[in-house]
Amino acid sequence: MAEVNRIHYELEYTEGISQQMRIPERLKIASGSSEEPPGLLNASHSTMMLVPERIVIAGDDNDARFGRPRDLDLIQSTPLETVELKTPPRVLTLNDQPLDFLEPEPAANSTAQPREEMKSHFRSRREQCRSENSTMRRNGQINKHDFASPSPSRAPVRVCPPLISPEDSQNLNSASGVLNYIKSTTRRAYQQVLEVLDDSQRGRASLVTFDASVENTPDDAGLTDAASLRRQIIKLNRRLQLLEHENKERAKREMVMYSLTVAFWLVNSWIWLRR
């Protein structure tokens, strides 16, 4: 019975709310001095909304109220020219591709023929000089009439002494010996480099009187010394790397042995104290 009364009460409550409550057509914040005409209240909402015929953009010549912005004139006056872009090559070589390959197409087409001719001319001259130098080396001697002054004697090939001595290899058991070994070998290598540079400068000074075609030939003695010195430096670098690796391994072994020794003495002392 109570449930039926509750349902009946809820129905009456909702019916009273729906009959008495209405949504007002207008909301007034404060009453004004002059009341609006009733015709405006009875007007339809569709007649109050007006859609403009056109939308005026700032800068339109037909509308005098808006001035034309300068940015719009600048954008419209600037011609939109197409920019030509070239795909970069995968490999850049000076022989196949000149340094000024980024020039426009007309300039490149106009100067392509002279460049090819100059390249072919330089290539032929280079090959001719190489062939002449090879023939002169095969003969072993150069004709005296081809030079304004007698040719200087070729510098003898100097053999670089070894950087490693047996005395240094015997003192590699300690850290100080390794440091002394590195210092001595570095000093010897530096002295050999200075000697090679001095010899090359002397050879260049003696070749000043040669002809321009012979000046371009490489110095065999300097090349041999540089190659031997480079090999010795590479060997020294490898030896130093091996020494560093051995020192690291020795340090690890010493650390393990030291920790084991300390642990052994600690265990023995603990056992002795327990007794």
UniProtKB/Swiss-Prot annotation:
Chain intervals with Basic and acidic residues compositional bias: 114-130
Coiled coil residues, start to end: 223-253
Localization per Swiss-Prot or TrEMBL: Mitochondrion outer membrane; Peroxisome
Membrane topology: Single-pass type IV membrane protein
Topological domain ranges for the Extracellular compartment: 274-275
Keyword Mitochondrion attached: yes
Residues in the Cytoplasmic compartment per record: 1-255
GO BP annotation list: mitochondrial fission; positive regulation of mitochondrial fission; protein targeting to mitochondrion
Function of the molecule: Plays a role in mitochondrial and peroxisomal fission. Promotes the recruitment and association of the fission mediator dynamin-related protein 1 (DNM1L) to the mitochondrial surface.
Name of protein: Mitochondrial fission factor homolog A
Lineage, top ranks: Eukaryota, Metazoa, Chordata, Craniata, Vertebrata
